[in-house]
Amino acid sequence: MLARALIRRRQAVTTLAAPSRARSTRSRALLDELGAGAVAAEGVGRARGSSKNAFVRATTANGNETLASAGDGGSTSSASSSSTTSGGIMVSAAHPSSHPQVLAVPLPRRPLMPGIIMPVKVTDEKLIAELEDMRNRGQAYVGAFLMRSEGSSSSSAAGKEEDAFDALTKRTVASVGLDGEEEEGADPSDHMHDIGTFAQVHNIVRLPADSPNGEESATLLLLGHRRLRKLGTMKRDPLVVQVEHLKDEKFDANDDIIKATTNEVVATIKDLLKTNPLHKETLQYFAQNFNDFQDPPKLADLGASMCSADDAQLQRVLELLSVKDRLDATLELLKKEVEIGKLQADIGKKVEDKISGDQRRYFLMEQLKSIKKELGMERDDKTALIEKFTKRFEPKRKSVPEETVKVIDEELQKLSGLEPSSSEFNVTRNYLEWLTSLPWGVCGDEKLDIAHAQEVLDADHYGLEDVKDRILEFIAVGQLLGTTQGKIITMVGPPGVGKTSIGQSIAKALGRKFYRFSVGGMSDVAEIKGHRRTYVGAMPGKLIQCLKSTGVCNPVVLIDEIDKLGRGYQGDPASALLELLDPEQNGTFLDHYLDVPVDLSKVLFVCTANVLDTIPGPLLDRMEVVRLSGYITDEKVQIARTYLEKAAKGKSGLSDFDATITDEAMSKLIGDYCREAGVRNLQKHLEKVYRKVALKVARAKSTDTTLDPIVIDVDDLVDYVGQPPFQTDRIYDETPPGVVTGLAWTAMGGSTLYIECTSVESGEGKGSLKTTGQLGDVMKESSAIAHTFTRGFLQSKDPGNDFLQKTSLHVHVPAGATPKDGPSAGVTITTSLLSLAMDKPVKPNLAMTGELTLTGRVLPVGGIKEKTIAARRSGVKTIIFPQGNKKDYDELSEDIREGLEACFVSTYDEVYRHALDWDR
């Protein structure tokens, strides 16, 4: 079979020797076809060139030796040689001294070196017949010439043997007449190199036809003898050339350079044997036939034949007649071969190490599994998973709903029948992982101790009495009933007042597990209710994740920023929360992933929001709202001293250093730098102050300077936090006619709001009103109502005053970049119009708020606490509130109401008496 692999379609001449293991295999296969017999090494004498039937001795790849006859008369060998070298086997044989004309045999890939046996395949019948005739006449000698390459090296062509040989064959056939045709006037020998090798045909073996046209082929064994030069063409069919036999240039065998180069070639060949042991047989044969390595010309040819260089480099060695130059060229090729061999060995070793390491680990793991399985210590993955799920589920079976028990049992049965490699196996495994991990009926211990809860809440937060009272009420009910139920508490207030942090304190006070997630910007319903299991990477919703994370069915869950829910093409999360936050429905909450009811009725939900306007009505209806107002200055001072200052010093590394802020500086820091309703900005400023103190302390330590305690006073604030961004809320110390102080509140807290009114032009029919200041539709309507009401009210108070009928008025609300809207400015705008019309200023240090109807009724408004705090911060002494807000004002603590006079009115006539009917 290996011999048949040597036969190629459309090949005229092919060298079968190659520098690789595969090429040696082909050579051995060919020799087997020729009838080479293996004999014992001890039973074979050394080859000698003087005998007619001298034997050529060579060592085969399997360790045996074969004999090849190379007599003077050209008799064929009874056994051929196998080669493990690049170009064949080096031999010593007798040969005639002169042949001026020889039959030319083209070699497509590698030149034949003297002393080397090379198998060659020919397919031309005429050439085969001529060679057989020459052998019968005892003149079986030819000239072997390497074909000239066209555009690419033979080494690259060897990678595409079929295409490259086809091209060479076409040129050879056209030149030497293997197909009976030739180019007019062209010398076919021009396609071959001028320097070749005088070779003896050792044997010719006919091979069976392997081409579509039934052509036969033959394989030659060529033994190279010496170099020759092609002088010209004598005959074209077949190609016979005139040659000149060449001899090596004379050299001094005792020359130091030649000796050194020879020794280096020998050493390099030994190095090559370490990386490529396939050359070892050739070297052993060479040592046996040439006594030692002190024959430089033969050593150079041997070394070149062992190299896998391209045809141009090997042809250069063949053409060198200078022994010194030939040794140098061979040494260069051998050095390259050694480096390539080392690189191949390194790559092979790395690959073998990796493969052997992986295989060893695999075998050990398999053995370990087998041992454990025999001992009953381990089962396969599927069995282990089923046991794990069963072990996890059995203790909870009695507390799990019957419907869920049925689903889990079915899924376990389904898992046992699935192959671990199937995709459904992973889906079922993940589903069971979630089902068996949930805390079915497992409730955490909670502390229903009012005193403990009060202590924890007061330790973490200052104020927030409404929230604290609600939690204490929740605990009290739980004490009396002996059990607690889930509730939905929503805390609404400006940023920085402690809504989120109070949720953690509630969990600590109750002794429950705490879980927080934010729904701000959430637009995917799957975040709440989970994904369908059919989707890749499906997961349950946040609430199911919460139960698995906490491991109990009664945690405190903080849903942050519920007023900022989004809405997109994935659905409406606000609508999904309806089921979650409904105490009547969340006992059987259905997650899309689990698809079994889950009891959330024992969960205490705490939601946070800045405003209620953006929360859908049906969702808001399910919540218990607790409002958190902003802090006044005194409260902020207490919070700063009790909580923020200590934390800021600790973060700055000043826990052991004496650095304090005076009370005056703290009040100024709050009043001029941190006027927001919460204390988050105050916390940032305190951290900034103590960071600068830390810088001073660090610099003092670096210079071994003792730093005195640092006291930060009012005058030092500029150095620590810069210039104050706020000066005062009051634009006017004394309001002129037409200017009134109003009160407003937003999600950021309360603030004072000035209403300014002035006349533009007067005359008959000019009684119009213009409004500016980015007023919303509701506020514009309030202005129109106020203008209409003021006309009638002015006539009742001052019948002869026709100012409003004849004057165009302009109402403006300062801070024009800030949008403003709401109905609570009605009484303020009316008072501003009356003040201008009557040319009478409003009572000093007075502010008001309230919605005015067209008939003069004053309706209640919201944000009483925030507005009261804003009025006090601005230095207001008297506040006019609607009568309907008296209950809200009475609920305020004494420290907020201290120093304020509140006037409650139900009609505008009462507003007029408090604001305009006063003596200057």
Curated annotation (Swiss-Prot):
| Residues in coiled coil | none
PROSITE patterns, per database record:
LON_N, LON_PROTEOLYTIC, LON_SER
Catalytic activity reads: Hydrolysis of proteins in presence of ATP
The Gene Ontology biological process annotation of the record reads:
cellular response to oxidative stress; chaperone-mediated protein complex assembly; mitochondrion organization; oxidation-dependent protein catabolic process; protein quality control for misfolded or incompletely synthesized proteins
Keyword vocabulary terms for this entry: ATP-binding, DNA-binding, Hydrolase, Mitochondrion, Nucleotide-binding, Protease, Serine protease, Transit peptide
Location of region: Disordered: 65-94
Primary subcellular site in the record, as a coarse category: mitochondrion
Q: Which SUPFAM superfamilies match?
A: P-loop containing nucleoside triphosphate hydrolases, PUA domain-like, Ribosomal protein S5 domain 2-like
Keyword Hydrolase included in the entry's annotation: yes
| Any single Pfam family the record assigns to this protein | AAA
Write one Gene Ontology MF term: serine-type endopeptidase activity
Cellular component GO terms, alphabetical: mitochondrial matrix
Give start and end of each Lon proteolytic domain: 734-918
Question: EC number(s) on record?
Answer: 3.4.21.53
* First and last residues of the transit peptide: 1-58
Q: What class of enzyme is it?
A: hydrolase
Limits of the Lon N-terminal domain = 102-338
Q: What does this protein do?
A: ATP-dependent serine protease that mediates the selective degradation of misfolded, unassembled or oxidatively damaged polypeptides as well as certain short-lived regulatory proteins in the mitochondrial matrix. May also have a chaperone function in the assembly of inner membrane protein complexes. Participates in the regulation of mitochondrial gene expression and in the maintenance of the integrity of the mitochondrial genome. Binds to mitochondrial DNA in a site-specific manner.
Q: What family is it from?
A: Belongs to the peptidase S16 family.
Official protein name in the record: Lon protease homolog, mitochondrial
